Swiss-Prot record:
Gene coding for it: rfcL
Subunit structure comment from the entry: Heteromultimer composed of small subunits (RfcS) and large subunits (RfcL).
Domain of life where this protein originates: Archaea
UniProt xrefs under InterPro entries: AAA+_ATPase (IPR003593), ATPase_AAA_core (IPR003959), P-loop_NTPase (IPR027417), Rep_factor-C_lsu (IPR023935), RFC_lid (IPR047854)
Function noted in UniProt: Part of the RFC clamp loader complex which loads the PCNA sliding clamp onto DNA.
Residues that bind ATP: 63-70
Keywords for the protein's UniProt record, in alphabetical order: ATP-binding, DNA replication, Nucleotide-binding
GO biological process: DNA replication
Protein name: Replication factor C large subunit
One of the record's GO molecular function terms: ATP binding
SUPFAM superfamilies named among the record's database cross-references: P-loop containing nucleoside triphosphate hydrolases
Record-linked PANTHER family: CHROMOSOME TRANSMISSION FIDELITY FACTOR 18, REPLICATION FACTOR C SUBUNIT 1
Amino acid sequence: MAIPWVEKYRPKTFEEIVNQEEAKYTLASWICAKFKAPREFCTRWAKKKDKEIVEAKAVLLAGPPGIGKTTIVHALAREIKYELIELNASDVRTGERIKQVVGRGLREASLFGYEGKLVLFDEVDGLHVKEDLGGLETIVEIIEIAKVPVIMTANNPYDPKFRPLRDIALVINLKRLSEDDVVEVLRRICANEGAKCEEEALRSIAKSSLGDLRAAINDLQMYLSSGKKILTVDDIKRVGERNPQLSMFEILDRVYRARWFDEARAISFNPSFDWEQYFLWALETIPTVYKDLELMAIAYDRLSKADMFLGRIKKTQEWELLPYALELSLGGISQVKNKPRLPPFIKYGFPQRLLLLAKSKEARRRREALVEYLAQNLHVSKSFVKSELIYVLSAIAKKDHSIIDRLSKALGINALDIKNLLL
Ligand SMILES: Nc1ncnc2c1ncn2[C@@H]1O[C@H](COP(=O)(O)OP(=O)(O)OP(=O)(O)O)[C@@H](O)[C@H]1O
């Protein structure tokens, strides 16, 4: 597989990072004031002497996706010859784990040729503070005692829960890149790839990227895939036309009728593809398409494997597993051995599960309100009400209907609601 251009063209030096001069000056001034760094680098970049910069304990780089936050730290480490110890939100879910990784990184001797170590907590706003057993506190603790530079990045660190990080670190805001900045980088890449790219085409890519250079570079690579050496504005329009909004019926039809694995897999690139919805539809349409039990079993087996990946993603936020789930649920159910010729028209039914959820929405809402009311008034958790109390009350109510009225009076809730819930 071709190397992604976002990696191939990731700037290696401070100089190559486009239009983030202020951020580069501030970051370099902080590093040069507090840590060992090459003289030439400091002379070129460390232009600021503000107290708040030179005394900061750590740095938090903030700004929208794809504008160079991670890149600037990688380039800095290379410029000052520091070894990078990098953690992202999925590594740093628990305080314990953070301490393990950072501690091990700091204890081990640096590889030959490095002057020191630099800790990067990438995308700290990906931390779900409540569930993150101590993640945030541990980062603050590490910053307090660290003798090495600690840098964090975040798309949106302004949520009140990240206040401890903002308080302890110097926040450096990176700018959203302009359309011209993005076009400039794309033009350089075209030249380097030996491709002739129309200015208008590059502008159109830049416009839809909304300043996210990563997205723009990825789009350019897609347009110039399979060795194409010319990019015109018509190519861009054509791809837009090739990717119309599809209904779920059309998506399913394309998946089941795909002739190759890749053809089915590629449907996930359509802008209207919603994998969670698709999954529900796939679950119920397999028997409509495959009448043969053996084929049905194969398709369900693949879908169940995809479901295992999805379960794991939901639990651990390991989003890098999503491609496996998609391959199994698209290519996997489309390409079964000895697939029969499909009839020209297949009637895909609306998933019963969605219908049921829609029908029972009101009942579920009432039940939820009642559970909440019971939990609050009886000073127990909602899960206790759902998992235990309701069964006890229901068993009593089956023998003695008067409990419904008594509960209704005591709690001030309609007797019918209580009856529906318990019986
Ligand atoms: N200012 C920039 N100058 C040059 N290239 C850039 C710049 N910003 C981003 N890029 C390109 O975009 C890619 C993604 O950048 P980077 O990973 O640094 O984004 P980010 O701001 O950290 O985004 P996220 O918050 O999504 O991680 C880089 O590999 C690089 O190719």
